């Protein structure tokens, strides 16, 4: 997942006659400058790029816990509900703009403020900061674990730190430098590199999984039990997280009446890819499937290149994903002024959290079950219900309330399950 995938907390307009260079970049400032309206194929591609990210790497381990059939059903349920809630945001924005007569709602935060006032924007801001920071914590865990797996063949400790912790701290000074850059325009090509590596690595891993399965054929579980259902929901929600980018993507679509079709097609294709990746990974390694599937690949040339490529990808994606966090924090604490000390302190906090998390997939489930569920299910249904409260039929009110309650239930139960898994792993 990239920086522009999650941007969407607030919007800022330029005064007339001013240049885009006269103001610091914000979370919804395009990395590559102004863009023309997107055609239908480009809209589809943008949606695909905005959603596919590092969460897919934890799906095989999740299938090991949930069982392969329950894992597939969970992915189908989450993708369908995510698509429904994305369209709720689009319909809510269109409704509010039809009442005002102005196209002033360009982000999730704008929508929250339009529906619920400053409190709505505050809630979106907080959820955005937590989700983006959570994504970056998982990135650091992946990078450190991958480097330790490739370069450290023992259980040696230095100054009481294991190999993964040493590599994590080794990333810290470089991340301070990267995150000190006020404008990330020069890092934009890395975003393209990230997308290419993600897709290529996914395909390579899936092909290897097929050959390994044909050789080993390990026993597989169909259902892992009800107790792990909410754990799987959390990881799936994390993997499909991208709702913060829906409104900007719909705004730049040339054929807005066909946006839902492009969004649905992209979600369907991503669901198939995620299901195949999770299933093949679990089929290849069975109960030996690790929390980061790439660590199962061994030390061959191809597997090493895949792991290094993904690690480098996420290392340089880190500052892009943190940009919305800096926009929110600097806007609220520093009157939107650039502050290197705020950025460094934020990177330090994210690094410390990464040190405390023992398992990659468990942390994905925690982030997905908590903040991603609130952003993806709870807030869209709440905003839609509030905006259309005087027009909805009883059936539609029941649907919105049901989605809201499902989101709250997943958030509470899934968070508890993920925390329990993390504490159990830590013990």
UniProtKB/Swiss-Prot annotation:
Keywords: Amino-acid transport, Membrane, Transmembrane, Transmembrane helix, Transport, Vacuole. Residues 1-42, 91-122, 179-186, 249-262, 322-339, 384-396 are cytoplasmic. Coiled coil: none annotated. Ubiquitous. It is found in: Vacuole membrane. The chain crosses the membrane at residues 43-63, 70-90, 123-143, 158-178, 187-207, 228-248, 263-283, 301-321, 340-360, 363-383, 397-417. Residues 8-24 have a biased composition (Low complexity). GO terms for biological process: aromatic amino acid transport; neutral amino acid transport. It is a multi-pass membrane protein. It comes from the Eukaryota. Pfam families: Aa_trans. InterPro entries: AA_transpt_TM (IPR013057). Residues 64-69, 144-157, 208-227, 284-300, 361-362, 418-427 are vacuolar. Residues 1-35 are annotated as: Disordered. GO terms for molecular function: aromatic amino acid transmembrane transporter activity; neutral L-amino acid transmembrane transporter activity. GO terms for cellular component: vacuolar membrane. Belongs to the amino acid/polyamine transporter 2 family. Amino acid/auxin permease (AAAP) (TC 2.A.18.8) subfamily. Translocates preferentially neutral amino acids and to a lesser extent aromatic amino acids from the vacuole to the cytoplasm. Requires ATP for function. This is Amino acid transporter AVT3A.
């Amino acid at each position: 997942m990239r920086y522009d995938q999650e941007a969407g907390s607030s919007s800022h307009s330029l005064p007339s006659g001013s240049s885009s260079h006269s103001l610091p970049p914000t979370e919804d400032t395009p990395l590559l400058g102004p863009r023309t309206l997107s055609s239908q194929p480009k809209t589809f591609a943008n949606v695909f790029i905005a959603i596919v990210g590092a969460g897919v790497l934890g799906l095989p381990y999740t299938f090991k816990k949930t069982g392969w059939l329950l894992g597939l059903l969970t992915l189908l349920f989450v993708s369908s509900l995510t698509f429904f809630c994305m369209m709720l945001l689009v319909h809510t924005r269109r409704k509010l703009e039809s009442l005002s007569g102005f196209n002033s709602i360009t982000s999730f935060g704008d929508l929250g403020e339009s529906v619920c006032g400053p409190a709505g924007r505050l809630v979106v801001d907080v959820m955005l900061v937590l989700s983006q920071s959570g994504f970056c914590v998982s990135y650091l865990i992946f990078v450190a674990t991958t480097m330790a797996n490739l370069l450290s063949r023992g259980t040696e400790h230095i100054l009481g730190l294991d190999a993964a912790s040493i590599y994590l701290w080794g990333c810290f000074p470089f991340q301070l430098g990267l995150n000190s850059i006020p404008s990330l325009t020069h890092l934009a090509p890395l975003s393209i590199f990230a997308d290419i590596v993600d897709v290529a690595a996914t395909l390579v891993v899936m092909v290897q999984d097929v050959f390994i399965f044909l050789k080993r054929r390990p026993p597989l579980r169909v259902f892992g039990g009800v107790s792990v259902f909410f754990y799987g929901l959390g990881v799936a929600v994390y993997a499909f997280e991208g709702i913060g980018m829906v409104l900007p993507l719909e705004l730049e679509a040339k054929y807005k009446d066909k946006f839902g079709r492009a969004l649905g097609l992209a979600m369907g294709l991503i669901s198939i890819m995620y299901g195949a990746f999770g299933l093949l990974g679990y089929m290849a390694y069975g109960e030996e499937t690790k929390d980061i599937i790439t660590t199962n690949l061994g030390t061959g040339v191809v597997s090493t290149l895949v792991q290094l490529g993904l690690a480098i990808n996420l290392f340089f994606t880190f500052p892009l994903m943190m940009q919305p966090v800096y926009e929110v924090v600097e806007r609220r604490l520093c009157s939107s002024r650039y502050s290197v000390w705020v950025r460094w302190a934020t990177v330090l906090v994210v690094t410390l959290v990464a040190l405390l998390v023992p398992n990659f997939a468990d942390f994905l489930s925690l982030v997905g079950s908590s903040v991603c569920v609130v952003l993806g299910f709870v807030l869209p249904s709440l905003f839609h219900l509030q905006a259309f409260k005087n027009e909805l039929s009883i059936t539609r009110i029941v649907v919105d309330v049901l989605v809201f309650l499902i989101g709250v239930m997943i958030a509470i139960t899934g968070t508890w399950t993920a925390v329990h898994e993390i504490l159990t792993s830590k013990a």
